[in-house]
Design a protein with these regions (language model features):
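Divalent-cation
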Residues: 1-174
Length: 174
């Protein structure tokens, strides 16, 4: 598991879609995850330390977990299948520890409220992690070392991979 931090939430000026950018704590790899506007707002409100007159859904869930004697231990972005990310919330109670399946956007919104670590599996970062140019914020090509011994087929970018990244690249370019 790789520890991550919330780097930013970005909004596309063309279609107003939101993406949360998680940064690997010990390197310069980033994990962009497209999220809905409500989840983006819930994360941003907490990161900016803003107060809202009534609890948001993620505040409510954190309160329910706490009032039932549980604590959120960490969240984990654990899988990526068909361009869909999966996450788990690790909740501890006196008797046991449970992992609850959820969307990464909800998991991150809970993590920033509970001030708990955010992790991503190495496999997820290998599939979807990117490097960003620090000046432009645009994605850089993947780097491979000479001892990786990867075949051309393993390193060649397939058309379907380009298509799935095109929305993110268009977003960064806008």
């Amino acid at each position: 598991m790789l520890e991550m931090t919330v780097d930013s939430i970005r909004v596309s000026p063309m279609n107003y879609q939101r993406v949360v950018i998680l940064k690997e704590k010990e390197s310069d790899r980033y994990l962009p995850i497209w999220i809905g506007p409500a989840e983006a707002d819930a994360i941003a409100v907490k990161l900016q330390d803003l107060s809202v007159p009534r609890p948001l859904t993620h505040d409510l869930l954190a309160t329910v977990i706490d009032s039932m004697g549980g604590t959120i231990d960490h969240i984990l972005v654990n899988d990526l299948q068909n361009d869909t990310f999966f996450a788990k919330i690790s909740i501890k109670t006196n008797e046991e520890s449970k992992e609850i399946d959820c969307r990464p956007s909800d998991a991150v919104a809970l993590a920033v409220r509970a001030k708990v670590p955010i992790f991503a599996n190495e496999e997820v970062m290998d599939k979807a992690g990117i490097h960003l140019d620090q000046e432009t914020g645009k994605p850089l090509g993947r780097e491979t070392s000479s001892d990786d011994n990867l075949t051309k087929e393993q390193t060649e970018v397939k058309p379907e991979e380009l298509k799935s990244m095109s929305a993110f690249t268009d977003f960064i370019d806008s």
